[in-house]
A protein has these predicted regions:
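Sec-dependent signal peptide recognition
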Residues: 2-9
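N-terminal signal peptide c-region/cleavage motif recognized by signal peptidases
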Residues: 13-15
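A short, Trp-centered hydrophobic/proline-enriched beta-strand micro-motif
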Residues: 20-38
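Structural recognition of beta-strand segments within beta-rich domains
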Residues: 38-41, 46-50, 54-60, 65-68, ...
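A short, amphipathic edge element
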Residues: 101-113
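Gly/Pro-enriched, hydrophobic low-complexity segments
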Residues: 116-172
Length: 172
């Protein structure tokens, strides 16, 4: 279940730019807020989305790499060899819908509404298994790119992901 939370928190932010065939890359910061703790656990890294998959590299505080290719999820071991992560398969179709910003597929999984904050949407899961993990997602975009995602977990913890695209001029 922990891998499921990680996969969804890592990958839910791709709906806007995944629809293009052009590879997108950038950096991220992820703040994981746990109930009962005053300071969040913060990680930073980089990502690259290409037609053939996604690479998500955490640089700090602990280096790790997550890959999605051909409907499968992998992590890299100490020798940089991909290791299949069993149990992640049920989420690949959902993740692909998010990555492609397939609103028809997303509407099957979520109730989607505009958020009070301009440029943001709230997604409420319909699936019982997904509801056990998350109460809602907030997706925000700026200049046609995902800028922030907030994942509210059912247990009260939440994660905030922020994205930057340093190698791409921001659209006006």
């Amino acid at each position: 279940m922990r891998l499921s939370v990680l996969l969804l928190s890592v990958l839910v932010f791709f709906p806007v730019f995944a629809s293009s065939a052009v590879t997108e890359q950038g950096t991220f910061s992820q703040e994981k807020h746990f109930k009962g703790f005053s300071k969040p656990f913060i990680s930073t890294g980089s990502f690259e989305l290409a037609e053939d998959g996604l690479t998500w590299q955490v640089e700090s505080p602990v280096k790790s790499t997550l890959l999605i290719k051909q409907g499968q999820v992998y992590t890299l071991d100490d020798q940089d060899k991909p290791q299949l992560q069993k149990g992640a398969e049920p989420y690949v179709n959902l993740l692909q819908a998010i990555l492609k910003h397939d609103e028809v597929a997303l509407a099957e999984q979520f109730t989607m509404t505009d958020h009070a904050e301009p440029g943001c949407q709230t997604l409420l899961p319909k699936d019982d298994l997904l509801k056990q993990l998350f109460s809602q997602f907030e997706l925000c975009e700026a200049a046609e790119q995902v800028s922030r995602v907030r994942l509210q977990e059912a247990n009260g913890n939440f994660t905030v992901l922020r994205f930057a695209y340093p190698n791409k001029e921001q659209k006006q």
